[in-house]
From Swiss-Prot:
Interacts with DDX4, PIWIL1, RANBP9 and TDRD1. Plays a central role during spermatogenesis by repressing transposable elements and preventing their mobilization, which is essential for the germline integrity. Acts via the piRNA metabolic process, which mediates the repression of transposable elements during meiosis by forming complexes composed of piRNAs and Piwi proteins and governs the methylation and subsequent repression of transposons. Its association with pi-bodies suggests a participation in the primary piRNAs metabolic process. SUPFAM superfamilies: Ankyrin repeat, Pseudo ankyrin repeat-like, SAM/Pointed domain. GO terms for cellular component: pi-body. This is Ankyrin repeat, SAM and basic leucine zipper domain-containing protein 1. InterPro entries: Ankyrin_rpt, Ankyrin_rpt-contain_sf, Asz1_SAM, SAM, SAM/pointed_sf.
C-alpha cells in the first residue's frame, strides 16, 4: 500500500550542499494525493517518505511524519539530518518548523556545520539571512570552522552576502579569523570581487593588513584577480568605523542590526547594521535627505557612495538630478591642479605691467588652493590615534616632511618679501628719475587741468568787465 503511494514519484538525480556532493538526497516531485498518511508505514518507508517531503518542501507532510514518531534529528545517508538539508536549500519555513520541533542547530557532519551549510547555500541573500537568524536564535555557534578552518563568515563573504556578514558579526563572529591558507573573510571577499562585502567588513573592523600564508594581503589578492577597484579601495581607504562594534555589547549591536517588522507574517524582514551618521550629514548638506532611506535599504555607506560610477548610481535608483548634486559636491572637494607652466615668463624685459600683475594674482590664487588643501586634511584627520585604521609608518617620517614644508613656506615668504622690496625700489627710482617720461594718461590729465584753469580765468575777466561796464552806464 505504501509502496503504491510512492509510485507517483518522478525522481531526477541531483545533489546539494557546498562542501559535500554525497548527501544522498534525490530531488523529485511528490504527488499531493500520495502525501497523506492513510496507515502506519514501516520505519524504512517512513524515512524515505520523510526525505521526499523535505525535498519538495512539503511542510504539512513533514509535520505529519514528525507527529507519527520520526526523529527530528534522523540521520539519513551520509549522516545528513533534516535540518542540514533544509538549510542547504535555504527553506526558511522548513528550518523554522524543524527548529521548533527541537532540531539541533549545532549539528555537524565531518565539521560541516548547519550554519556553514546555510551560508554557502545557493538561495537568495534574503532567504539566507532569515535562515541564519533562526539558527543563531537557537544558539548556533558562528565561530565553528570546517575542515579547512573556514568559518561561516568566510563563506558569506566568499559568496557576496554583506547582510549575512553583518548579522554573524552582531552575534559574535570573529572578523579576522584565518583559514588554513591564511585567508580572512576580507581576503575571500577581495578574491571574489565583492565590493559591498569589502566595504561592510571594513566597517566591522576587518584588518586589511593580515597576510595569507603566501605573504599576500587582501589588496594584493584583489589585484591578482584583477579586481582593480577593490585593490584601490583597500590600498587607499581610511576606516573611521573600525572598532565601533567591538566597543558595544552583543545586545546593543543586535538592536542596531535587526529592524524586525512587528507583524511576523510580513516575511520577517531583517535589515543589517549600518552606521550612517556621516552619510546623513553629507546628504543633509546637499539637500538630499530624501535619499537616506533608499541608501539605508541598499546598505550603501558614504565611502561606497563617493566611489560609485555613473552606472552604479542608476542601478541603485539615484536620479540624474541627485547624481549631478553629488558629483558637483565631489568636484568642489578637489583642489585645483597647480600648473606653473601656464604662468607668464616674467624674466622677459618686454613684459607688460598687466601681465606681471596677472602673474602675481595667479601665484596668490595657487597659494590659496594650497592653504585650502591643508585645511581640508586637518579637518578630515581623526583627532584620536585609535580611530586611525590604516597601518601608518612611523610618525617621525610625517613630522619631518611637515618640518620641510614649514621651511619651504618660510623660504617662500622670504622670497615674496624680497620681490615686494624690489618692486618698491623700482617705483621710487622711477619717480626720482629726471629722464622719466610721464605716461600718456598722466600728460592728458595735466593738459586738461590747465585748459580748465584758463577757461575759468577768461570767464572771470569777462564777468568783471561786464560789471564795470554796467556800473559806468548807470552813472
Amino acid at each position: 500500500m505504501a509502496a503504491g503511494r510512492l509510485r507517483g514519484l518522478a525522481v531526477a538525480g541531483g545533489g546539494e550542499s557546498s562542501e559535500s556532493d554525497d548527501d544522498g538526497w534525490e530531488i523529485g516531485y511528490l504527488d499531493r494525493a500520495s502525501q497523506k498518511l492513510k496507515g502506519v508505514l514501516p520505519t524504512e518507508e517512513k524515512n524515505e517518505t520523510f526525505k521526499k517531503a523535505l525535498t519538495t518542501g512539503d511542510i504539512s507532510l513533514v509535520q505529519e511524519l514528525l507527529n507519527s514518531g520520526i526523529s527530528v534529528d534522523s540521520s539519513f545517508r551520509y549522516g545528513w539530518t533534516p535540518l542540514m538539508y533544509a538549510a542547504s536549500v535555504s527553506n526558511v519555513e522548513l528550518v523554522r518548523v524543524l527548529l521548533d520541533r527541537g532540531a539541533n542547530a549545532n549539528f555537524d557532519k565531518d565539521k560541516q556545520t548547519i550554519l556553514i551549510t546555510t551560508c554557502s547555500s545557493r538561495g537568495s541573500e534574503e532567504q539566507i539571512v532569515k535562515c541564519v537568524e533562526l539558527l543563531l536564535s537557537r544558539n548556533a555557534d558562528p565561530n565553528v570552522p570546517c575542515r579547512r578552518l573556514m568559518t561561516p563568515i568566510m563563506y558569506a563573504a566568499r559568496d557576496g552576502h554583506p547582510q549575512v556578514v553583518a548579522l554573524l558579526v552582531a552575534h559574535g563572529a570573529e572578523v579576522n579569523t584565518q583559514d588554513e591558507s591564511g585567508y580572512t573573510a576580507l581576503t575571500w571577499a577581495a578574491r571574489q570581487g565583492h565590493k559591498n562585502v569589502v566595504l561592510k567588513l571594513l566597517e566591522l573592523g576587518a584588518d586589511k593588513m593580515l597576510q595569507t600564508k603566501d605573504g599576500n594581503i587582501p589588496s594584493e589578492i584583489a589585484k591578482r584577480y584583477k579586481h582593480l577597484e577593490i585593490f584601490s579601495l583597500l590600498s587607499l581607504s581610511l576606516n573611521p568605523l573600525k572598532g565601533k562594534l567591538q566597543q558595544q555589547t552583543k545586545e546593543e549591536t543586535i538592536c542596531k542590526l535587526l529592524a524586525t517588522d512587528s507583524d511576523k507574517e510580513k516575511d520577517h524582514i531583517f535589515s543589517s547594521y549600518t552606521a550612517f551618521g556621516d552619510l546623513e550629514v553629507f546628504l543633509h548638506g546637499l539637500g538630499l535627505e530624501h535619499m537616506t532611506d533608499l541608501l539605508k535599504e541598499r546598505d550603501i555607506t558614504l565611502r561606497h557612495l563617493l566611489t560609485m560610477r555613473k552606472d552604479e548610481f542608476t542601478k541603485n535608483g539615484i536620479t540624474s538630478r541627485d547624481q549631478q548634486k553629488i558629483l558637483a559636491a565631489l568636484k568642489e572637494l578637489d583642489v585645483e591642479e597647480i600648473k606653473f607652466g601656464e604662468l607668464p615668463e616674467v624674466a622677459k624685459l618686454e613684459i607688460s605691467g598687466d601681465e606681471f600683475l596677472n602673474f602675481l594674482l595667479k601665484l596668490n590664487k595657487q597659494c590659496g588652493h594650497l592653504i585650502t588643501a591643508v585645511e581640508n586634511i586637518i579637518t578630515e584627520l581623526p583627532v584620536n590615534s585609535h580611530k586611525i585604521v590604516l597601518e601608518w609608518a612611523s610618525p617621525q617620517s610625517f613630522t619631518s616632511v611637515c618640518e620641510e614644508l614649514v621651511s619651504n613656506v618660510e623660504d617662500l615668504s622670504e622670497e615674496v618679501c624680497k620681490l615686494k622690496d624690489l618692486i618698491k625700489k623700482l617705483q621710487n627710482e622711477r619717480e626720482n628719475d629726471p629722464t622719466h617720461m610721464p605716461l600718456v594718461e598722466e600728460v592728458s590729465t595735466w593738459n586738461s587741468r590747465m585748459l580748465k584753469r584758463t577757461a575759468i580765468t577768461v570767464c572771470g575777466f569777462g564777468f568783471l568787465l561786464f560789471i564795470c561796464k554796467l556800473t559806468f552806464l548807470r552813472k
